[in-house]
Amino acid sequence: MTPEFSRPVRIDTLGGSPRALAIEAGEEERATLARRFGLVAIDALSADMRLSRDGDAVTAAGTLRAEVIQSCVATDAPVPARIEETFTILFRPQPAGGADDEIELGESELDVVFYDGATIDAGEAAAETLSLTLDPWPRSADADAALRAAGIRSEEEARAEEERAKAARSPFATLRKP
């Protein structure tokens, strides 16, 4: 499967000094990524990065910028967001073994992307970075009011009500003076 926002970089074209790379998603790429990530729209998506090679490993460090529109989890209203996220990704060759083998990564290796072959995909790495920066629970400005109108309490209200109910069920509740 070809990624929606593919920007392949051949590793053998990277020399000893870092190489600057600027990528930007076109309109069709943004539309297909929006569908992939369940977004209303992606109005802009770009990344500026420096690629550094050390043997078979390539480090991409830079900044991702995006303008997205998500749906409010409470009202389904559009929630625009502007994203600017710095990232550092280490591309390493796929380890020997099957694709389904479990690979243990240390904490310092959490942003590792494995590649197979002679290229890395800077666009797909940017798309994955975008997906990780999205708000998992976007809420519009009127979300709280809509939830209250539907009879849904906030966590604080539910917690306070539970505490009152717990105190009322206490065997010592009848000993309390009014």
Task: Please place each PLM-identified region on the residue numbering.
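Charge-rich, low-complexity linker and terminal segments
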Residues: 1-15, 20, 90-178
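Charged, alpha-helix-enriched surfaces in structured cytosolic catalytic cores
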Residues: 24, 28, 63, 67-70, ...
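Helix-adjacent hinge/juxtasegments
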Residues: 65-100
